[in-house]
Amino acid sequence: NEICTALGENYAIIIKLHPFCKEKYEIDENLRNRIIDLSEADELNDLLFVTDLLITDYSSVVFEASLLDIPMLFYAFDLDEYIENRDFYYDFKEFIPGKTVATQDELITAVRNKDFESEKVENFKHKFFDDIDGKSSQRVADKIISLLNLEN
C-alpha cells in the first residue's frame, strides 16, 4: 500500500504471492483499482506478458522474465536472514539480473528513476540459456520428427 501510494497514479501493481504463502495481502480500499492481487492465478507466465517491471525477492521467475527482457528489481529486505536460513546456489548479488534494494524507500527511488541495472538481464540470459533465437519450437518439432522417423 505504501509503495503504491508513494509511486502515484501512473503505476498499477499486480501481486502474485508464492503458492505456499497462505497470508492474505490486505489492500487499502482506495487502492484496489491500482493494486491487483492475482495470487490465485494459475499461470505466472501469462502475467509476465503484461509486466513492465518485475519486483521479486528470491524467486526463480527471473529465468522466464529474463527471456522476455523484463527489467527487474530485487527487494531483498531480509537477505542476511535468508542466506543464514536457506542460502543460494550462487552468490546472490553476482547472480541476479537487476538491482538489489533493501528498503521500501530504495525500491521507490529505483522505480521512479528507472534504475533497474537492466544491462544485467542480457548477460544473465546468455549465461543460462543457449540458442535464444526464437526457433526453439522448430528445433523441438524437428527432433520429434527425427525420432519418429528412426522408429519406422
Task: Annotate each PLM feature.
Residues N1-S39:
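Catalytic donor nucleotide-activated moiety binding site of glycosyltransferases and closely related
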Residues D42-V50:
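Short acidic alpha-helix that forms the nucleotide-activated donor recognition element
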Residues D133-N152:
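C-terminal alpha-helical cap of glycosyltransferases
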Residues E26-N33, S60-F128:
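Catalytic binding pocket for nucleotide-activated donors in carbohydrate/polymer assembly enzymes
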Residues I14, I36, L53-I55, L73, ...:
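Hydrophobic/aromatic beta-strand patches that form the interior of the parallel beta-sheet core
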Residues F49-S59:
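Acidic donor-binding loop of glycosyltransferase active sites
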